[in-house]
Design a protein with these regions (language model features):
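C-terminal active-site/capping subdomain that shapes the small-molecule cofactor and substrate pocket
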Residues: 214-315
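N-terminal Rossmann-like NAD(P) cofactor-binding subdomain of oxidoreductases
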Residues: 2-174, 274-276
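Oxyanion-binding "anion nests"
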Residues: 178-206, 210-212
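Predominant activation on well-ordered alpha-helical scaffold segments within soluble catalytic domains
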Residues: 19, 122-129, 183-187, 230, ...
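General small-molecule cofactor/ligand-binding pocket signal
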Residues: 31, 197-199, 246
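Short amphipathic alpha-helical segments
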Residues: 107-109, 209-211, 278-280
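Conserved active-site and cofactor/substrate-binding residues in soluble primary-metabolism enzymes
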Residues: 9, 13, 116-123, 177-184, ...
Length: 315
């Protein structure tokens, strides 16, 4: 079957990557609008209604507008924005979390692609909370290092400009008021009573993300955390072709340093349990533009259209 797809907002970083990836696949027919019509509500409505699936690569307000424009159609919506990730009636597009999540993506009319930082946090926390190893009322903290491509076209231009300012040479913490837009999904999808303290950091490299959750043994419901947390994550992701858990020898291959840009260009995600049985670090390593963005969208689209989950992914 040929699927008609309209990417609303294909001019942005995520939209362009999705468009280019789908253009290489014969099962998709891509609807496009001329430049002068891409913000025209009537033209967008017509394209959305003509599509089998509309992929929204827009700011939150515009994504909500597109969903409203889709009313009265049978078009399925795949939204990459923050607007609907914890909204009732929307499937959360991280199918590795559970059969329920996978089935919701497969059959849902409305699917929300997870946030990049949130993906790394939830991949680690959600299975451990579900298993009871992390209490639901745990007071967690998390820091996340990302390449500057996560900031979109404007930030990419700032970092790559000949006239860039010296402050861009250093890592830059942001989200300083603990109101980052990924926090609601980090809490809700992980089934936590409290949102974590979240410290995102953007650094001077293009792509790649490393999310870390530091823990004391006293925060956990286990006596041998490194062994037990690793075993839990390995069991949870045993059947996943995309998310995997590294063994000690795999971690040792990094030589004592984990480069956050190592997964650039990949759509996979690697998880690690580091430290010792008193002080532990849970780490996820992936491309913010891959499993953190366009790769996750392609994975969801594959499931929505009945294609093999990894079709078109670079693992």
């Amino acid at each position: 079957m040929a699927w008609t797809v309209f990417i609303d907002g294909k001019e942005g970083t995520t939209g362009l990557r999705i468009f280019d990836r789908l253009a290489e696949r014969g099962e998709f027919s891509l609807l496009t609008l001329p430049e002068e019509k891409r913000k025209d509500a009537d033209a967008r409505r017509e394209a959305i209604h003509a599509a089998d699936i509309a992929i929204l690569c827009l700011p939150d307000a515009a994504a909500r507008e597109s969903v409203a424009l889709a009313e009265g159609s049978n078009t399925r919506i795949l939204d990459t924005s923050t607007a609907h990730r914890v909204a009732p009636g929307w499937a959360y597009g991280f199918p590795e979390l559970s059969k329920k999540h996978r089935d919701a993506v497969v059959s849902g009319q409305y699917v929300a692609v997870p946030g990049c930082h949130a993906s790394g946090f939830i991949a680690l926390a959600a299975p451990l909370v579900a298993a009871g190893l992390i209490p639901v009322d745990a007071l967690l903290s998390c820091f996340s290092l990302t390449g500057y491509s996560g900031g979109g076209k404007k930030m990419i231009a700032q970092y790559e400009a000949d006239t860039r300012t010296p402050d861009l040479d250093a890592p830059r913490p942001y989200g300083l008021t603990q109101s980052h837009k990924h926090l609601p999904e980090m809490q809700q999808i992980s089934c936590l009573t409290h949102a974590p303290i979240f410290a995102p950091i953007v650094a001077d490299y293009y792509a790649g993300m490393q999310v870390t959750i530091p823990l004391f043994r006293q925060q956990l419901n286990c006596a041998h955390p490194v062994e037990e947390l690793t075993a839990c994550l390995k069991a949870h992701y045993a059947s996943s072709p995309i998310v995997s858990v590294l063994d000690a020898q795999d971690v040792a291959a990094f030589g004592g340093f984990i480069p956050a840009n190592a997964p650039a260009g990949k759509d996979s995600m690697k998880l690690m349990v580091l430290g010792n049985d008193d002080r532990i670090e849970l780490v996820s390593l992936f491309d913010n533009l891959g499993k953190g963005s366009s790769g996750a969208a392609i994975e969801c689209l594959n499931l929505m259209t009945g294609a093999p989950e990894t079709t078109g992914l670079n693992l």
